[in-house]
């Protein structure tokens, strides 16, 4: 290797290392449970929410035609078997926070999807639960957070009057894989 090549190698080595480091850190994937500072929808979720209106339990009763395709976040309160292998979820509706709460602001892997502490309504969602969410430690159960995209036809549950929707897509966050706004005080850095 001649002197010119050695000099060029020395001059470009820091640039190369910086580029490699930048590429490695830029490729952080929030994964299925959204470990990122800001909410990161999955590709399927982005497609499913196209044309959906965020669910409003009051306005949806007044103008159900505006909420034919709707989407919402909520915490599962109850899950019961429904007809034809479907599941009936009773959901406490929550507002998703703009920023996720992170245990360590320098490590996105400590960030969790964050929703409000209080509910702003309730809804029943009839969904097909995926096999990986059906049983086991990470099963969809009371305490899970869900992002649901659904069809709404103005129906209400006869027993409690809550709106009933038919899920066309969901994203599941098992208990302890998301946070509520109250966790911010505990995790303050």
Model regions: which residues?
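OB-fold and OB-like single-stranded nucleic-acid-recognition modules
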Residues: 27-189
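Intrinsic-disorder/low-complexity regions
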Residues: 1-2, 55
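Bacterial N-terminal signal peptides that target proteins for export
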Residues: 2-16
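C-terminal motif of bacterial Sec signal peptides marking the signal peptidase cleavage site
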Residues: 22-26
């Amino acid at each position: 290797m001649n002197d010119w090549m050695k000099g060029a190698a020395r001059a470009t080595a820091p640039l190369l290392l910086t580029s490699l480091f930048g590429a490695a850190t830029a490729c952080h994937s929030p994964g299925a449970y959204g470990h990122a500072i800001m909410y990161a929808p999955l590709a399927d979720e982005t497609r499913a929410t196209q044309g959906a209106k965020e669910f409003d339990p009051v306005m949806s009763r007044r103008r159900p035609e505006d909420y034919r395709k709707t989407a919402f976040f909520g915490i599962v309160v109850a899950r019961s078997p429904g007809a034809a292998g479907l599941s009936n979820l009773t959901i406490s509706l929550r507002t998703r926070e703009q920023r996720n709460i992170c245990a360590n602001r320098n490590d996105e892997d400590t960030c969790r999807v964050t929703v409000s502490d209080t509910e702003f309504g309730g809804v029943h969602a009839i969904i097909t639960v995926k096999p990986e969410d059906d049983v086991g430690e990470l099963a969809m159960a009371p305490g899970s957070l869900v992002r649901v995209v659904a069809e709404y036809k103005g129906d209400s549950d006869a027993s409690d009057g809550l709106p009933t929707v038919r899920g066309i897509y969901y994203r599941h966050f098992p208990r302890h894989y998301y946070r509520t706004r109250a966790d911010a005080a505990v995790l303050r850095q």
